[in-house]
Design a protein with these regions (language model features):
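Extracellular glycan-interacting surfaces
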Residues: 1-143
Length: 143
């Protein structure tokens, strides 16, 4: 389970979805469920980005929140549907997504996505950022 904090709000990926706490972790509320699992949660400028997995449709969704995790907007309409989206990060004004088709970039907060680097056969990239450097770690079949 990954935990991130922004402006006093804690967010975490859990086996039931994405959970939120506004009192230092004493109480938690489920904020994204979709009948699935919380895969990842990341800090982005002004909020959070989350990846969830729906066990019924077998797809992963990518969403952002800019109000402390109260509401979430989908940003994955331009990404090919898949059960294996591994990560989403922000560097500067750009979002990057580790996807089975490769690494995608969005320069408009997820409205559109462009393939930057095609995938390696049977791999999906987990992305990590340090400053302005993006590290892409290939993994078999996603997370």
């Amino acid at each position: 389970m990954k935990l991130v904090e922004f402006d006093g709000v804690l967010m975490a990926a859990s086996m039931k979805g994405i959970i939120r706490s506004t009192n230092g972790g004493e109480n938690w509320a489920l904020v994204i469920n979709e009948g699935g699992v919380g895969i990842a949660i990341e800090n982005i400028q002004g909020g959070f980005a989350a990846i969830t997995y729906n066990t019924t449709s077998e797809t992963r969704r990518v969403r952002t929140s800019y109000d402390g995790g109260k509401t979430w907007q989908p940003i994955d309409a331009g990404l090919p549907a898949t059960p294996l989206i591994a990560s989403v990060i922000q560097v500067g004004e750009n979002f990057f997504c580790g996807h089975p088709d490769g690494i995608f970039r969005s320069s408009d907060k997820g409205k559109t996505w462009k393939l930057l680097l095609p995938s390696i056969e049977n791999k999906v990239f987990n992305l990590s950022v340090s400053g302005n450097v993006i590290y892409a770690i290939p993994r078999n079949g996603g997370c």
